[in-house]
Amino acid sequence: MTDEQRPPATPLLLRRDALASGWSDDELGRLVRAGELNRLRRGAYVDSVLPADAAARHRLLIRATVVGLRRPAAVSHQSAAVLHGLPLWDVPLDRVHVTRRPRAWNDTSRVLRCHVARLRDDEVTEVDGIAVTDPVRTALDLARSLPHEAAVVALDAGLHARALSHDVLRGRLLDIVGAPGSRSAARAIAAADGRSESVGESRSRVILHRWKLPPSTLQYEVRSAGGVLVGRSDFAWEEERLVGEFDGRIKYGRLLRPGQDVGDVVFAEKRREDAIRDEDWDVVRWVWAELHRPDRLAARVRRARERASATMTRSRGVALAAGLLQNPESANNTPRAGVRAGGPPASR
């Protein structure tokens, strides 16, 4: 349809506004059937196609829902996370979550989930003109209500963006001790780490801890003997000289520089891995599909640790043998079993 035939040009079109502009329900219905409008929910439409991104669609659904609320409420939980720009994993976004203070009732519909809970004034902020729980309250709500892995993903992202801090989270956690979900929240907060740089890294860490394969550190810098930075890895098991890398398409996209394509980044990553191996570190990699099979990821990392440990043992043996060959006298000075160096045989 032409510009003259279109309803008012806004990303979100409300039925009441269209009717006020002279449009009828029949006309709106025809536009929906023709695919020129998409119905978000009853009485709310968007022009042309819906965004492919789930978070972008949910932002539109939030706006469409909030304008129809008859009583004050703050957008909360995963809906608040979307407004704050926190990435989510495996969290349903088919309904808008809001929180009202006590004496309200728990409204639930196909597109709305209303929580009734105490809500301090300083726990509410505004995003794009919409009342929303602040990042800390949002994080606590998610930590109380989501499964552990999904909660850690959101908390990691907030900590990495410095929208959250462990000290503030732990302080606010004291306010909800004994409340439903408070133990789950405490566990998720204890597991969260802002050094994770992606959903995949967060999920990997949770899985590795669950399978008793925790890395000794994150974002480990491998340096040459002269102290030159060779590369930084997502995970490290320093005792075995093993680093771990989660490979995701989003990660490679984030590394792109102007004029580069993904192939250039993959080649640069291969060169970086070769340089890390040249410093006598082993490398283990995994991809998104393996996060859906935690047993396979755990088996891959366990085998890599065993190989790296065996390599370390052989290297130490070779180094010891080389040292003895260069200094045969040291072999004669090596204490025999049951004999203390510089003293009489040990008593039995």
What are these regions (language model features)?
Residues 1-181, 200, 217, 306-348:
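Short gly/ser-rich loop at a beta-strand->alpha-helix junction or flexible surface loop bordering the NTP-binding
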Residues 6-9, 22, 159-348:
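Surface segments flanking catalytic/ligand-binding clefts of nucleic-acid enzymes
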